[in-house]
Amino acid sequence: LAQNGKNICEIEEFEKEPSLGNGGLGRLAACFIDSIATLGLNGDGVGLNYHFGLFRQVFENNMQTTVPDPWLTEKSWLTKTDVTYDIKFKGMTVKSRMYDIDVIGYNNTSNKLHLFDIESVDESIVEDGINFNKEDIKKNLTLFLYPDDSDDAGRILRIYQQYFMVSAGAQMILEECEK
């Protein structure tokens, strides 16, 4: 790279890492999608399109604090689709929007990672650090990958997130089967 006037550090920083989580299960899922693409098999992944994904830790006034990590930019691999689904919860319905990321395998084979987002998400509800009203599901469902679930509101939000993803994914599969 150096012989061609390129710097590996600059290349590594050129594109932000999708802040979709890099824990064991997320990494394993990514490897599976890549492997199935490489083998030429059909198999797409489903997840949630978190606006802030993980969070960053910074020092302010000699204190460690957490701040949102806005990984989504206009220069993203994420492709907005026209696909939407209504997700019905008790007492409310929210609209999901599907975004796609191509997962490229060896020899140009590929599959897709379908990420669902809530159309009514509101990034402005994030307060000090990464705090937000966890009970306003219509505005917060896809804000953070790991919302604080140390209280009932956080645990209920996680259940809403899981239900939202499963419902949107199931509707997508049923729609494909009907074609």
Model-flagged regions — what are they?
Residues 1-179:
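A conserved ligand/cofactor-binding region detector
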